[in-house]
C-alpha cells in the first residue's frame, strides 16, 4: 500500500464523515484527523482491507469526539449546500427527503446503512469498523432499511401506536 492508495480513499472518507457529522467543516476536520492518525500509525497496519482500516479509525475518532464536549463552534456552516442535487426539481426534493430520512435513523442503523450501501463495505468489514458482530450488522442494516422505507413512504404514524396488553 502506498500513500496514493490512501489518497484514493479520501472521497469515500469525506462522504462518510459528512453523513456522520452533518456538517461540511466538521467532516473535513474528521477526515484530516483520520488521515493524520493513519499516517502516524502506518507501521501498525498489516495487510488487509485499507478502506476498512481507515473507516475504523474514522469511526473511533468520531465516537471519541461525540463523547467529549464540543469546544469549537463552526459558524457559517449553515450557508453550505446540503448535498449536490441533480438537474430536476423533483430529483432535488427526493434527495432532500432521503437525506432527511437518513438523518432520522438511529445512529447505529445510519452507520451500517452508510457503510454497506454507500461505501460498499462487506458485512465483515463493516463489523470490524464498528467493532460489532456480523449478525449485529445484518440486523441493524435490516432495521435501518425498513425504517428508511417507512420514512420515505410517509407511512409512519404521527403518534406511536400503543397496544393494550391484558
What are the residue ranges of the model-derived segments?
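A short, charge-rich alpha-helical start-of-domain segment used by transcription regulators
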Residues: 1-15, 25-28
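Residues within helix-turn-helix
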Residues: 25, 124, 135
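Σ70-family region 2.3-2.4 aromatic/basic alpha-helix that recognizes the −10 promoter
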Residues: 32-39, 48-68, 141, 145
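Arg/Lys-rich amphipathic alpha helix in sigma70-family domain 2
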Residues: 56-76, 91, 150
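Acidic, proline/glycine-rich intrinsically disordered inter-domain spacer in sigma factors
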Residues: 68-69, 78-103
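A short pre-motif secondary-structure segment
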Residues: 112-116
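DNA-recognition helix of helix-turn-helix
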Residues: 130-154
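Short hydrophobic short-linear motifs embedded
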Residues: 158-166
